[in-house]
Amino acid sequence: MKMTRLYPLALGGLLLPAIANAQTSQQDESTLVVTASKQSSRSASANNVSSTVVSAPELSDAGVTASDKLPRVLPGLNIENSGNMLFSTISLRGVSSAQDFYNPAVTLYVDGVPQLSTNTIQALTDVQSVELLRGPQGTLYGKSAQGGIINIVTQQPDSTPRGYIEGGVSSRDSYRSKFNLSGPIQDGLLYGSVTGSVTLLRQVDDGDMINPATGSDDLGGTRASIGNVKLRLAPDDQPWEMGFAASRECTRATQDAYVGWNDIKGRKLSISDGSPDPYMRRCTDSQTLSGKYTTDDWVFNLISAWQQQHYSRTFPSGSLIVNMPQRWNQDVQELRAATLGDARTVDMVFGLYRQNTREKLNSAYDMPTMPYLSSTGYTTAETLAAYSDLTWHLTDRFDIGGGVRFSHDKSSTQYHGSMLGNPFGDQGKSNDDQVLGQLSAGYMLTDDWRVYTRVAQGYKPSGYNIVPTAGLDAKPFVAEKSINYELGTRYETADVTLQAATFYTHTKDMQLYSGPVGMQTLSNAGKADATGVELEAKWRFAPGWSWDINGNVIRSEFTNDSELYHGNRVPFVPRYGAGSSVNGVIDTRYGALMPRLAVNLVGPHYFDGDNQLRQGTYATLDSSLGWQATERMNISVYVDNLFDRRYRTYGYMNGSSAVAQVNMGRTVGINTRIDFF
């Protein structure tokens, strides 16, 4: 397991709070405690885990306007896209979605609802907070939660009127406009605006890549339009409430834009003569019904949610033009019961869960003179699960926790097509049962200092390839499973927050791509081990001022008995990472000034299992200055990537040569927000 080299680091992490113990004070009552939607703040699952919670003001200060910018404020998290925003590449703690872009290693939740995998990268609308839970969360969250969970919590309408308008412009003719209005319709009963709690967002982030064949010079960017409506029925002095939310998002993108591997400062695409511009249009509709009933000892939650997504995608691939429209439908239902109150010896959570996903894919690969390949595929996946999570408070300082989840997964596929006039097709069905568990123990050494240990399991279910492959049968792959061992500590006072952990994760039956180039399919082909240590600290060293610092070192490798990549590094996992920021408030007679300076370091990593395509270490520096011009007006200017550092975000072998996607470089902008109330 190669844990010996981590023991000194683990010991150091446990001793860190002792250094700061001279500053011990009672924890500020306003300290935000992670709840992660499914647990009580007193549960072992919420406390015996490495977690980070970021508030809306912190997101705004860091310029986090979309989920792929969350690594700026969530240490250890890495998010990029592989081609375009439909296919996110996420890594956390050495667990990576490198081998299956339809199943990210970290699951994104919005108000307790899991998002479609192709909707993981999305604009953020009216966010109240973001929570990150590190390590497998399989017992409470089920499949595809091997690396962890990101839970976005949005602002819910209540009796307080709220409203604002926001706008900004930035480099490459980009701009952003946003409107929000919420409040009581009938005070004490129904909350929302006249038509509900409304948020409207238009976000344009243009690129600067050039297609020499068409002359287009703004490729590589996105243009998103989003609207949502919320209603909340919550009568005063009643133990129940109900909610409804609906949203629609449409994004146009030109992101399938690549340059030569060694031409990362160039703007001309590596593309065949006469090739059209890449284009993608994604539209997603979401609806959620929720209810809550509270007694003296229990709280019951019911959620039913639906998502419908369709997208069209066209891009050049060598001498071929690819058209790949796709439709997704997903519905989720969950019933959850949890204990309530602070005087209980045992806290409990019980739940029933169902998730059904259906997908249809049409694809066509055309040569200049004739069709090459066309196919139509249908896949389904369904999960039925029951889970429980218990915490036994042995004393007021010592607790132990355990959880178990039983899942029944079903999947099916049916596809047909033609390759150079030769038909192909197949169909299949599979089902599988999984039992996952987790155990943890935590002890409060002082009122501010906690140590814990945790063992938890995660998995990705069995299933079929989304994209049909000519000449191959419909053969399912089995579930990928992982187990994580963790030792950590957390120290919190009004002035200092410290968190450290060391971990080891073993993954088996990895779902890897295998087969000849152009005919690759997912199959079970290997194991991987990830070991690492992480540290996160925040010091509020003066009124209105704080200093954040974080870092991690990770070794994530395929084991020697892996069929394809034995001994190689797992792709998309940086060997190390670090970040630091200083935030402050300077009071002046003309209004408060709010400076921020942040640096982020990303270590070397590979884009392929063969470890041929390597991105070296890079660092970026971001700065901003906010001005509270009046009580209701805020103006901020910012420069992201101040020194215009260019680096690769994704790459692959195109024939005998490699191509890469690169970041956009320096971005300068200004934002203004005006509050109505």
Regions found by a protein language model. Give the residues of each.
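N-terminal periplasmic accessory domains that precede
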Residues: 67-70, 89-93, 129-132, 144-168, ...
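Periplasmic-side early beta-strands and strand-to-turn transitions of outer-membrane beta-barrels
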Residues: 159-160, 166-168, 180-276, 308-319, ...
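Structural signature of Gram-negative outer-membrane beta-barrels, strongest in the C-terminal barrel
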Residues: 228-235, 245, 337-340, 345-355, ...
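Surface-exposed extracellular loop regions of Gram-negative outer-membrane beta-barrel proteins
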Residues: 250-265, 355-367, 412, 417, ...
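Gram-negative outer-membrane beta-barrel transporters
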Residues: 348, 396, 400, 408, ...
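C-terminal beta-signal and adjacent terminal beta-strands/loops
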Residues: 543, 547, 601-608, 626-677
